[in-house]
Amino acid sequence: MSKITEKIAKLLALAESPYEEEAKAALLQARRLMAEHKLMPEDIEPQENKKVVQECVGVTCTKLSSPWTVYLSTLIAAHYCCRPYRSSVHGSKVSEIGFIGMEDDFKLCKLAFLYAYDCVASRCRQIRTQKGYPAKTLREMCNSYGWGFCRGLSAAFQKQEAEHQEWGLVMVVPQAVEDAVSKMKRSSYKISPQSSINRQYAAMGYADGQEFDMRRRLEPSA
């Protein structure tokens, strides 16, 4: 699995563009590779020889500045055999994103999440350079784009699942991970989109996700 992890890491590094189409291509391709190799018994290492990793990944968020980040972590974790969680100091509005998963799964999940997050963050930086808008409006544009990106990626994942229903047999969260999650203190966190959505920016990410051909851009090297 270490070779597979390395191959997928290289795949994620292939796309130099910060735009969402490249991010979705890399994420979808990485997931396809992971699922395909898990379907090959000779490439699977015994899970009992691996450890459960619980670790934050260095990305913080608040309900005001980047509420879509939690949704993104939930979406990606579900497709990389991991579970997401948030870590925060009592009384603080800032949360840090973390994941729990088997060692190899965690590495892939972390790579995928950070890559997707960086792509959204890069576009948000571009949005904030626009002149003539108050800070509140720019924030709404950025958050709307973030929600759109997540929904577009979700649609792409759903399409992939429909095309490869057999992956559902292997793309599951290991019981050891579920056991670790059950021991954690749970906290509620509403991740519904804000009421003020900029439809133009939300539609931008969603449409890109719906129209994207996941095999068109990036193919792994032999």
Regions found by a protein language model. Give the residues of each.
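Long alpha-helical, hydrophobic tracts
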Residues: 1-54
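Extended, helix-rich structural scaffolds rather than catalytic motifs
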Residues: 39-222
